[in-house]
């Protein structure tokens, strides 16, 4: 039996993908049936982090070692991820949401529609305020763009106003939000978005 929603979470290394998955698990686990698949190139570091932090029960988390380019495992040949998702859906019938976190990648990363229904793309302010205007599928076509680490703007000389203007121009009417996932600022917007996507 398939889950109600398969949600991809992508973005560059260190942008806050795992922090977002962890925060959503904590917010939603008492209301929804959840599972997570994480991707790392040579380790299962993100899966182990989620397990250690108690985001979900260990059996609801699968770590995939891609062994190569991160976007290949979520786009060109996503069979290893599809197998992990199917395994979770078989083990836990009635899942509401399976989150698939990609390995850290560049702005060209995108998920295969065979793997996920929707994608959240995470970037961070520390990479500079020019990132939104650089474009790429994650910036322009993701279902939700999350601009994380807004608390670091003053330390790296990033202008949130510039980022907002560029994001509005690049995304037109597609949703996006600023977050500081360490304090959960802006997380309500992400949670609301996810809940709206899950079929009744």
Curated annotation (Swiss-Prot):
The record's keywords, sorted A to Z, are:
Chaperone, Cytoplasm, GTP-binding, Nickel insertion, Nucleotide-binding
Q: Which residues bind GTP?
A: 11-18
Keyword Cytoplasm attributed: yes
Cystine pairs: none
Coiled-coil segments: none
Example GO molecular function term? GTP binding
- Major localization listed first in the record, in broad terms: cytoplasm
The GO biological-process annotations, alphabetized, read as: urea catabolic process
Task: Please tell me one Gene Ontology term that the record gives under cellular component.
Answer: cytoplasm
Localization recorded for this chain is: Cytoplasm
UniProt function note: Facilitates the functional incorporation of the urease nickel metallocenter. This process requires GTP hydrolysis, probably effectuated by UreG.
Read off the PANTHER family from this record.
Answer: UREASE ACCESSORY PROTEIN G
Q: How does it assemble?
A: Homodimer. UreD, UreF and UreG form a complex that acts as a GTP-hydrolysis-dependent molecular chaperone, activating the urease apoprotein by helping to assemble the nickel containing metallocenter of UreC. The UreE protein probably delivers the nickel.
Q: Spell out the HAMAP family in the cross-references.
A: UreG
Family, per entry: Belongs to the SIMIBI class G3E GTPase family. UreG subfamily.
The protein's name:
Urease accessory protein UreG
Species annotation: Synechococcus sp. (strain CC9311)
The encoding gene is ureG
């Amino acid at each position: 039996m398939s889950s109600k929603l398969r949600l991809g979470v992508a973005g560059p290394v260190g942008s806050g993908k795992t922090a977002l998955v962890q925060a959503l698990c904590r917010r939603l686990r008492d209301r929804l049936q959840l599972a997570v698949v994480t991707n790392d190139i040579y380790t299962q570091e993100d899966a182990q982090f989620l397990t250690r932090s108690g985001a979900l029960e260990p059996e609801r988390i699968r770590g995939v070692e891609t062994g190569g380019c991160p976007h290949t495992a979520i786009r060109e040949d996503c069979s290893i991820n599809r197998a992990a998702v199917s395994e979770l859906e078989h083990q836990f019938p009635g899942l509401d949401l399976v989150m698939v976190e990609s390995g850290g990648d560049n702005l060209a990363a995108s998920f295969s529609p065979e793997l996920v229904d929707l994608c959240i793309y995470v970037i961070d302010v520390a990479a500079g305020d020019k990132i939104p205007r650089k474009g790429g599928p994650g910036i322009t076509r993701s279902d939700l763009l999350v601009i994380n680490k807004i608390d670091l703007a003053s330390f790296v000389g990033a202008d949130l106003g510039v980022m907002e203007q560029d994001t509005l121009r690049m995304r037109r009417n597609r949703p996006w939000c600023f977050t500081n996932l360490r304090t959960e600022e802006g997380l309500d917007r992400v949670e609301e978005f996810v809940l709206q996507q899950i079929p009744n």
